[in-house]
């Protein structure tokens, strides 16, 4: 019986990122922030606090012909991250993210005694995680202007023949709320058998199979402060001058998503050991990494929803309705309304699957004074999960990148020159 507990606490500053300049050589010449290269130039303090508790109990029973073990684990995490998310001296936006996590796991393994010709192991694994994340994003005045107001005005036609349109946002700050519950449940049963001295002495074969089930879900509640904005449209010929003030555009996302995954993961291996410490081997196995949700995307989704609702507010305004040109204005506005937000498509990423192949050798040479390990591997991955920056350029998200192949070789050599060295 083993019982382990450990606790960690930290409260510190964080995220000392600095500006490295433009990537393109031509753009470097016109870089307006040259004086900030190599400098940390935040205007908001960044910090990180964490409280972490881990506990585990390991129980093992050894019978005459088998070993039974059970491992129970528990983890509690509470943290807070405050981040100047634009990483510059500008007053654009910041993030305060708090997490509270509780995880419990159990694994029971029933296996044979070592040294037997048939070595086997059968087990079951269960895991449940509760995770609540609060991550409101605060857009300050400069962020409201550059990331919402300017983007909205960029969508308006810029032609002498088209009406002149302008949108002005009156909010000094804009708070985009974010509250997320993302629990996950996982369970697995598995068996692996190794047959030693199969057909000839030194040849062993391993066959394993794991049935894995996982359920992930996300309950989201992102309610943002409504945008207060003014809008005007004007033309010289024919004369047209319409405007409305203090219109409102909300952004609200409330809902729940869930996904279930059931996978069979086989494993096959052959090894031939002709002398102790000298062997060749080959393995084939299927790998799996579960999918999940990008809660960081909700600030991007809120910006799109704001633009949609601002355009709808303009379209429904009685002050911007003209008897002669109303149909033309409505048609123009319809062409500038972004597509409706699909929360599931925008925030979900799929599981990653792979087939893994490896062959190699372990060699003991020169009367056990030289050891060499050689290996070659190949991985065929589908729906590979990769990290990328979000569309607004701030924060990272996980996406699926289709398929990829990885291959390579490794070599390691160790030597004992003398008995003491």
Which residue ranges define each predicted feature?
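Residues on the lipid-exposed face of transmembrane beta-strands in outer-membrane beta-barrel proteins
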Residues: 1, 57-61, 106-112, 189-195, ...
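Transmembrane beta-strands of outer-membrane beta-barrel pores
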Residues: 7-11, 63, 74-78, 126-130, ...
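Outer-membrane beta-barrel domain signature, strongest for Gram-negative TonB-dependent receptors
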Residues: 1-121, 127-133
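Membrane-embedded beta-barrel scaffold of Gram-negative outer-membrane proteins
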Residues: 58, 62-63, 67-83, 279-281, ...
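Transmembrane beta-strands of outer-membrane beta-barrel proteins
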Residues: 1-3, 68-70, 119-124, 203-209, ...
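Outer-membrane beta-barrel channels and translocator barrels
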Residues: 63-64, 113-117, 198-200, 275-277, ...
């Amino acid at each position: 019986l083993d019982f382990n507990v450990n606790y960690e606490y930290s409260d510190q500053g964080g995220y000392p990122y600095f500006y490295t300049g433009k990537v393109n050589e031509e753009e470097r010449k016109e870089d307006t922030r040259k004086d900030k290269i190599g400098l940390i130039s935040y205007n908001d303090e960044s910090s990180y606090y964490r409280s972490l508790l881990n506990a585990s109990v390991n129980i093992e029973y050894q019978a005459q012909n088998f070993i039974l073990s059970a491992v129970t684990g528990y983890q509690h995490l509470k943290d807070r991250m405050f981040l100047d998310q634009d990483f510059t001296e500008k007053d654009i936006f910041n993030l305060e993210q708090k997490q509270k996590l509780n995880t419990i796991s159990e694994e029971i393994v029933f296996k044979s005694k070592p040294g037997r010709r048939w070595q086997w192991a059968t087990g079951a694994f269960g895991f449940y995680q509760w995770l609540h994340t609060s991550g409101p994003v605060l857009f300050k005045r400069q962020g409201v202007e550059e990331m919402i107001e300017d983007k909205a005005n960029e969508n308006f036609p810029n032609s002498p023949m088209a009406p002149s349109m302008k949108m002005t946002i009156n909010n000094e700050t804009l708070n985009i709320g974010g509250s997320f519950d993302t629990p996950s449940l996982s369970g697995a049963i598995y068996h692996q058998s190794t047959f030693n001295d199969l057909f000839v002495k030194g040849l062993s074969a391993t066959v394993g199979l794991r049935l894995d089930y996982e359920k992930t879900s996300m309950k989201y509640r992102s309610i943002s402060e409504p945008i207060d904005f003014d809008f005007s449209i004007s033309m010289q010929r024919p004369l047209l001058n319409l405007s409305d003030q203090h219109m409102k555009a909300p952004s609200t996302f409330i809902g729940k998503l869930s996904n279930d995954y059931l996978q069979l993961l086989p494993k096959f291996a052959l090894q031939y050991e002709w002398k102790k410490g000298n062997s060749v081997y080959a393995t084939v196995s299927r790998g799996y990494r579960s999918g999940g949700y990008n809660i960081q995307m909700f600030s991007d989704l809120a910006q799109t929803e704001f633009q949609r609702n601002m355009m709808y507010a303009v379209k429904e305004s009685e002050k911007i309705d003209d008897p002669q040109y109303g149909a033309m204005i409505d048609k123009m506005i319809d062409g500038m309304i972004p597509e409706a937000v699909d929360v599931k498509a925008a925030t979900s990423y799929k599981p990653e699957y792979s087939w893994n192949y490896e062959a190699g050798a372990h060699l003991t040479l020169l009367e056990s004074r030289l050891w060499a390990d050689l290996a070659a591997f190949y991985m065929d991955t589908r729906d590979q999960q990769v990290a990328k920056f979000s569309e607004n350029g701030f924060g990272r998200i996980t996406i699926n990148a289709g398929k990829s192949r990885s291959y390579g070789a490794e070599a390691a050599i160790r030597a004992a020159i003398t008995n003491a060295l």
